[in-house]
């Protein structure tokens, strides 16, 4: 099976997250929050997974002691190449993965911040990928 372009795949994850909130989120405009925590959690997991697709494509992280890399491994790899991206990845981890994905923070401002960070990370990563991987 041919490996999909990481930028397109990350965008697909972002679209899935948007669709999850749009279709199931039951947004309350008076409270400026989504009604169901489980859909915010799903959207957060979609967003963060999309970012991991990009990070894995740009910064293949190998660990000797653990079977899977953790956020510190990604931050260390990103820090060597781009400090702005490091700040976005740190904020994205806190917003998409922790606040949305685990805590299920239902505030629209938090969810909007997660989508904004995802878009910024994709934008920077698209400039870093070789032309054959970036349409």
Located regions from the model:
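Long, charged low-complexity segments
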Residues: 55, 59-135
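Generic, low-specificity signal for short hydrophobic/alpha-helical stretches with a mild N-terminal bias
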Residues: 25, 32-33, 41, 96, ...
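Short, charged, amphipathic alpha-helical segments
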Residues: 34-37, 41-42, 108-112
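Charged alpha-helical initiation segments
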Residues: 1-37, 127, 135
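Alpha-helical scaffold segments in carbohydrate-active enzymes
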Residues: 16, 49-53, 120
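Hydrophobic alpha-helical packing segments in soluble, helical-rich domains
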Residues: 39-62
């Amino acid at each position: 099976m041919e490996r999909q372009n990481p930028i397109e795949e990350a965008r697909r994850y972002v679209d899935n997250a948007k669709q999850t909130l749009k279709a199931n989120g039951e947004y309350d405009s008076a409270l400026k929050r989504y009604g169901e925590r489980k859909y915010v959690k799903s959207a957060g997991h979609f967003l963060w997974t999309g970012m991991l697709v990009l990070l894995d494509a740009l910064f293949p992280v190998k660990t000797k002691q653990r079977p899977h890399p953790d956020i510190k491994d990604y931050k260390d790899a990103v820090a060597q190449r781009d400090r702005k991206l490091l700040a976005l990845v740190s904020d994205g981890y806190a917003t998409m993965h922790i606040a949305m994905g685990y805590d299920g923070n239902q505030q629209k401002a938090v969810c909007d911040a997660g989508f904004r960070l995802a878009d910024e990370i994709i934008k920077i990563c698209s400039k870093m990928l070789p032309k054959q991987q970036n349409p």
